[in-house]
């Protein structure tokens, strides 16, 4: 019985090894290709491409990259969520940057990185309430003007935000950091359950809970402070 089991395992391994994906290598000139999509209020990145959030007509996205790569980029809208990923039938070797420019407006409610790609903005974006999630190794770097912002890091990627908001929530459960020392907020709630660090600019009220090894650095001299520390991390005031 043991021999039969080992034989089956060996056959499965051989089958798995024989199913390696063909590689698509970026070739040719860098071209721009436009696509028209239905409206969306959320953006989710699930691959190694980069996304740039811009002002403009929602749904009119532009793909910039090697001319042979564009057909493999999947952009689909499901229940208001724009998902960006690569075709799963191939492996990819990016010789040039693959960038997708995605217009957004105040209706944007959520941005998620689940992969190695980054999400950035070259302009300040105006939103009402926005949640940003890092679940992989990619980073989020945005300039925002908002009423309420919420950030979650459960991977190794970092989040860097500048701008203004009324209320801010930050939850770290991974090794990634949150850099918000250029994001001015009146009220902030920060929680660390991992090793990532948090930097905040708070002017009125701060609530912080540290149960991991990450540190919280505060500037702005908030009037009300409630800090609970049960891990090895600490709070520093600038």
Task: List the predicted regions and their residue ranges.
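Sec-dependent bacterial lipoprotein signal peptides
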Residues: 1-17
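Short acidic/polar N-terminal linker immediately downstream of export determinants
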Residues: 17-70, 81-83, 87-103, 120-121
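Extended, compositionally simple hydrophobic/Ser/Thr-rich segments
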Residues: 41-53, 99-102, 107-238
């Amino acid at each position: 019985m043991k021999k039969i089991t080992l034989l089956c395992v060996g056959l499965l391994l051989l089958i798995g090894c024989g199913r390696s994906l063909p590689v698509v290598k970026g070739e040719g000139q860098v071209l721009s290709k436009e696509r028209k999509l239905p409206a969306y209020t959320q953006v989710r990145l699930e691959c190694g491409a980069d996304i740039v959030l811009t002002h403009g007509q929602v749904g009119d996205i532009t793909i910039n990259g090697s001319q042979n790569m564009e057909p493999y980029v999947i952009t689909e809208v499901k229940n208001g969520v724009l998902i960006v990923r690569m075709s799963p039938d191939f492996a990819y070797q990016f010789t040039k940057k693959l960038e997708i420019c995605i217009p957004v407006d105040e209706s944007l409610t959520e941005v998620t990185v689940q992969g190695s790609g980054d999400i950035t903005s070259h302009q300040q974006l105006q939103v009402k309430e926005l949640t940003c999630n890092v679940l992989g190794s990619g980073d989020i770097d945005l300039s925002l003007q908002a009423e309420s912002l919420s950030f979650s890091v459960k991977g190794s990627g970092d989040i860097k935000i500048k701008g203004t908001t009324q209320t801010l929530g930050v939850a770290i459960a991974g090794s990634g950091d949150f850099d918000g020392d250029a994001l001015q907020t009146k009220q902030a709630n920060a929680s660390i359950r991992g090793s990532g660090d948090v930097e905040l600019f708070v002017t009125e009220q701060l609530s912080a809970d540290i149960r991991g090894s990450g540190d919280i650095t505060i500037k702005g001299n908030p009037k009300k402070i409630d800090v609970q520390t049960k891990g090895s991390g600490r709070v520093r005031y600038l």
